[in-house]
Amino acid sequence: MKKLLALLLTLVMCLSLAACGGSGTDTSGTDTSSGETGEDSGDSSYRVAMICDSSISDGGWGMSCYNAMVDAAAERGWATEVSDSIAQSAYYDTIISYCDLGYDLIYAPGNQYTDAVLQAAEEFPDVAFALLNGGEDTPAKAVNGNVTSLLPNAQQVGWIAGALAGLMTKSGTVAFIGAMELDTTLGKYNGFKEAAAYVGQQEGKTVSTLDVVYSGDFSAADKGIEFAKAMIDQGADVFFGDASAVDSGARQAIDEANAASGSVSIYDIAQPSDLLGQNECIIGSQVTDNASLVGLCMEAVEDGSFGGEVIYGTLQNGALSADALSDLVPADVQEKYQGYLDQMVDGSFMQ
């Protein structure tokens, strides 16, 4: 039955591509949507397809991961396609449809796609599969050696945001919002929590992090609004998250709370790209250079060395960083923050 659904989906995609001439972007929330790389993409001999359960216009994770693929593809002359806002039940069928169409690389930005990727990778040994935030042990589970995990250091991601939260909180209470209970999300939460507490202690204050809450869905912006309001009521004044559109909903609630109070006193730290200026409450961003990680996968596909490895992203190799800070962060605090970031890079943070 799944094979039949996959074949039908492939037919629909072929007709869709023919109708639109292979270009254009449709992010309306249907099972498939076609993306574009650039003016040279149509002549490329290599093609990459991304699947995503959130929208690529969500202002967060989905958008950042899509842009990473497009940027890496543009640099190397690859053609791109994307299927976004897909349900969990459609992960496998959507992947298979791209494999049937002869795509060279399937890019799945999230640990939640692991089972579908491994199943498809077994059936299509000549297709490469890149799993962003995939487990360290996932490549070894691929019987054909055609799966690579791209793994930003989750603890360091949490540290980058947690240190800023520890410096900026006035209430001593900070908050973290998740979408799904993934190992990578828990790693970010724990890193955020320990860094906020440590930096707070260094600055002479006690900082606690509320228990993580999960929406169960990366697209549930309404849950972000609900969670943020409840956490603000519990005293949280700095937020971080790993929940895509849910984070966008949280920022909406934070902006509304600040507007009601007449001042910006509740803050949000964005990720995984620079979103400074998108919402008034955003004071900084933790940035992951996913484009460089995806680009390494494309290079490996081209030279025939792809698969069976974990590619790590860290502060030390430049894949992780903190971007520009808002003017809401005082100059002396910005200087202290840079000092803590330097400690993270040289390995002395929390030592």
Which functions belong to the PLM regions below?
Residues S16-A19:
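C-terminal motif of bacterial Sec signal peptides marking the signal peptidase cleavage site
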Residues G29-Q351:
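A residue-level marker of the well-folded mature domains of exported/periplasmic proteins
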